[in-house]
Design a protein with these regions (language model features):
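Ser/Thr-rich, Pro/Gly/Ala-heavy low-complexity intrinsically disordered linkers and tails
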Residues: 1-54
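Structured C-terminal helix/loop/strand segments within mature extracytoplasmic catalytic/sensor domains
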Residues: 52-124, 287, 300-440
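Active-site-adjacent helix/loop patches that line small-molecule binding or acyl-intermediate pockets
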Residues: 96-129, 137, 198-312, 316
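Short, conserved catalytic-motif segment at the N-terminal edge
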Residues: 134-165, 181
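Extracytoplasmic
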Residues: 135-139, 161-163, 167-172, 290, ...
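Active-site SXXK
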Residues: 165-191, 406
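Short glycine/serine- and small hydrophobic-enriched flexible loop segments
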Residues: 178-186, 225, 297-304, 433
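Short, well-structured active-site flanking segments
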Residues: 182-208
């Protein structure tokens, strides 16, 4: 299951504020019952009344050991879930909105420091607070999200590498599919999108196959190229720049993934009979060369399409994004959990205790992600998680929910690729544990 081939002008960079939680701050990994990171001046409970969640479980800084019989044995424990540990939420709803609430953009962290979250449109400042948490040579951007009065507010973190571009490998295949959806919508006067079928195949099932690498019946790499043929490579590159993300010219997107496109065809039909036929783009596009900031920002904007109207990918509809996130609706092949929920990588999940996350959210959590693996052992992942806290009446408890995006690339480190996979999982655990307990 290996992978194949912000704001306009780029973010400013800020140092860690006084009192920022470091490796030895109170409530570290392995410490239970520490502060939650509530809003300044708010009592715990908020919208959920006086409800206070259970204390945090002790989280070992080391991810789980390798199981006795990994399958396939020559793949990777966390990138490929060779121990079969992947979990899905018990609450099914394709129209899910993260039930996380905060009363103020001023957030008090576990160490008592107060940090400000900003709404979309505010100048982006990236705080370099991750340097001591991640391996040397790792590229990483984290976007923390707080919903204040239903409006998302953001705080960006990195280790100073957020603007450094690299080959993002297979993490970009979902962006190729998103671009394809956009082109189909515009070409069909918005009547055809990723909800359609081509050549007898539901596009949503093909998106799932991109993410879970089941080769049934096409390869993930070939499907990545197919979606570039549909969306167009020049347009894919434009999305990185003036058309959508406003990133620098040094970042480019439009390269293929090392396999030929399958013979699916380019005539698309919706269940209601709407059709469109397009001419495929078979040109060679610019190489894929993106930063972790760009990868994280793109996924953030896709997931928050409904909330952030000014940051929407042009042309795409929410039903297309539902297809990216969950796969085809009512899929007889994959069931309710397709699309990016089927990514084989479990870096977000091993970042904390999945039983605790399931219980405190009453099953109403989500993780959408996409892995990448380079030919020289570059381990990558980009993903979004919503981990709310609900009270006994399933109402959100203000100040306790967590919502975040992480884009990471670990190109070096460890004596083997398997050890590098573990190093990346350990870095995710260090970051996510601190997100959950309120130190970040």
């Amino acid at each position: 299951s290996t992978g194949g081939g912000g704001a306009a002008g780029g973010p400013a960079t800020g140092g860690a504020p006084a009192g920022a939680g470091g490796a030895d701050a109170p409530g570290g990994a392995g410490t239970a019952g520490t502060g939650q990171g509530a809003q300044a001046g708010d009592a715990p409970g908020g919208q959920g009344g006086g409800f206070v969640p259970e204390p945090f479980p002790e989280i070992d800084p080391e991810p789980p050991p390798l199981c006795a019989n990994p399958e396939p044995p020559d793949y990777f424990q966390f990138l490929d879930d060779t121990c079969g540990d992947k979990r899905f939420p018990t609450y099914e709803d394709r129209d899910f909105t993260c039930p996380s609430v905060d009363a103020s953009p001023m957030i008090t962290r576990a160490d008592g420091s107060v940090v400000l979250y900003e709404p979309a449109g505010a100048p982006v400042v990236v705080h370099e607070e991750l340097t001591d948490l991640v391996p040397a040579g790792m590229f990483v951007t984290v976007i923390l999200i707080r919903r204040v009065g239903g409006v998302p507010h953001y705080r960006y973190l990195s280790n100073g590498t957020h603007d450094t571009a690299y080959q993002p490998w297979s993490t970009t295949k979902v962006l190729a599919a998103a671009n394809a959806a956009s082109r189909l919508r515009i070409a069909s006067d918005y009547s055809v999108g990723l909800t359609a079928s081509a050549g007898g195949y539901r596009l949503g099932d093909l998106v799932t196959s991109i993410c879970n690498y089941d080769y049934d019946p096409f390869s993930s790499n070939g499907l990545g190229r197919y979606f570039h043929d549909v969306g167009g490579r020049a347009r894919a590159n434009d999305l990185i720049h003036d058309l959508w993300l406003g990133r620098p010219a040094s970042e480019t997107f439009g390269g293929n993934y090392g396999a030929a496109a399958p013979s699916i065809g380019y005539s698309f039909v919706e269940d209601d009979g709407a059709t469109v036929t397009i001419s495929p783009d078979t040109t060679s596009g610019p190489a894929n060369n993106l930063s972790s900031f760009t990868a994280a920002e793109a996924i953030k904007r896709l997931v928050l399409h409904r909330e952030e109207a000014t940051q929407r990918l042009p042309g795409i509809q929410w039903s297309d994004i539902e297809t990216l996130l969950y796969g085809a609706a009512d899929s007889t092949k994959y069931g309710p959990w397709g699309g990016m929920t089927r990514d084989t990588a479990i870096y977000h999940q091993v970042g904390h205790d999945p039983d605790y996350i399931e219980a405190r959210s009453k099953g109403q959590w989500r993780t959408f992600s996409k892995l990448g693996l380079g030919t020289s052992g570059q381990f990558l992942d980009v993903g979004y998680s919503c981990w709310p806290v609900l009270d006994d009446e399933e109402q959100p408890v203000a100040g306790y929910g967590r919502e975040f995006v992480i884009a990471a690339n670990l190109p070096t480190g460890g004596a083997s690729w398997a050890e590098r996979d573990r190093l990346l999982a350990r870095a995710y655990r260090a970051i996510i544990t601190r997100i959950v307990d309120g130190r970040l």
